């Protein structure tokens, strides 16, 4: 048996928040690669979306909503990579805000009901932000990264993301 059985998948009421945000950002940023994982030989510009571990109390309601702290990384190459990554970070903010104000939904993934900017886009010098003695590899020469953190609130989809096949 490969993967998990359909009847187990059908129990899920929420899909990964990244799946909803990938769909929203890909639609709102045509021509820009938007992903949740980095390829070994990545090309730029790039927007990377990742759910952060939550600290404190989770703000969702398992009957109706999900809540997530999400890190959004924007990468851009020279020339003008520093400015381009900053501008791309601002474009992401606008797309997410507009998705919230329009109650944007993605079938099987949910609806964005609120987006709060927790930490605005800021320049970072390596692949990921280190918060302890662990340090991450430097970015490729000529590539710039900005990181922002959002708190995203999601109403679960009307239909479960993985319904049983009929």
Predicted regions and their residues:
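A short, hydrophobic beta-strand-centered structural micro-motif
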Residues: 44-53
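Short acidic low-complexity segments
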Residues: 34-42
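Charged, amphipathic alpha-helical segments and their flanking helix caps
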Residues: 1-32, 53-166
